[in-house]
UniProtKB/Swiss-Prot annotation:
Residues 2-152 form the F5/8 type C domain. This is Discoidin-1 subunit A. The modification N-acetylserine is found at residue 2. Keywords: Acetylation, Cell adhesion, Cytoplasm, Lectin. The keyword Kinase does not apply. PANTHER family: DISCOIDIN-1 SUBUNIT A-RELATED, DISCOIDIN-1 SUBUNIT A-RELATED-RELATED.
């Protein structure tokens, strides 16, 4: 499996980090990103990992997001400047930051065996959560780690609405018999990034039929990110003087 196409939360600053304890002010979660390096010439940059101050199985590092994310993978790495790393851990997660659940019912996930090798663990099924936590279970030397969480890209709904799509007076649907249609090109106010879905509804109908059966329809055709064709149609003996419609277009971007 590959992390290609996934979003790195820590590397892209898309989450907040909190820890159970920190060894001191320069051994905090700020040093926990994968491949973090200090400058090697002073102690200001601190350790090349998050390091807990207490060494027991109650320690954790948690990543919290402003909106729920779909977590696909977690990556773990040891401390770059000392022989300290986490050899096994469990994952806990929450959708509301109140009720927490354990991945694989709290079973241990294999960690790392040296300072710098990155070990990815892809979840059995995607985890939908707002917050997710690593709880070290066993370790070498000290609880120290660098990590990353990979998620699906966040998609937001973008909507545009439009009105007054009009066939014109005494349109082509007002003569003849059988299936007839009038096509009205529609241009969106701005271009979508992805192909939208378009829904149409009538707001004016002016038609008649000798059998008292109104047969009309409207549908989108040739949808692009820039616009679509609005197709008004009728069939049989219906006489349609004019039709008017509105649209709503929505895309996930």
């Amino acid at each position: 499996m590959s992390t290609q196409g996934l979003v790195q939360l820590l590397a892209n600053a898309q989450c907040h980090l909190r820890t159970s304890t920190n060894y001191n002010g320069v051994h905090t979660q700020f040093n926990s990103a994968l491949n973090y390096k200090n400058n090697g010439t002073n102690t200001i940059d601190g350790s090349e990992a998050w390091c807990s101050s207490i060494v027991d199985t109650n320690q954790y590092i948690v990543a919290g997001c402003e909106v729920p994310r779909t977590f696909m993978c977690v990556a773990l790495q040891g401390r770059g400047d000392a022989d300290q790393w986490v050899t096994s851990y469990k994952i806990r997660y929450s959708l509301d930051n109140v009720s927490w659940f354990e991945y694989r019912n709290g079973a241990a996930v294999t960690g790392v065996t040296d300072r710098n090798t990155v070990v990815n663990h892809f979840f059995d099924t995607p985890i939908r959560a707002r917050s997710i936590a690593i709880h070290p279970l066993t370790w070498n030397g000290h609880i120290s780690l660098r990590c990353e969480f990979y998620t699906q890209p966040v998609q937001s709904s973008v909507t545009q609405v439009g009105a007054d799509i009009y066939t014109g007076d005494n349109c082509a649907l007002n003569t003849g018999s059988g299936k007839r249609e009038v096509v009205v090109p529609v241009k969106f106010q701005f271009e979508f990034a992805t192909l939208p879905k378009v829904a149409l509804n009538f707001d004016q109908i002016d038609c008649t039929d000798a059998t008292n059966q109104t047969r009309i329809g409207v549908q989108p055709r040739n949808i692009t990110t820039k616009g679509f064709d609005c197709v008004f149609y009728t069939w049989n003996e219906n006489k349609v003087y004019s039709l008017r419609a509105d649209y709503i277009a929505t895309a996930l971007e």
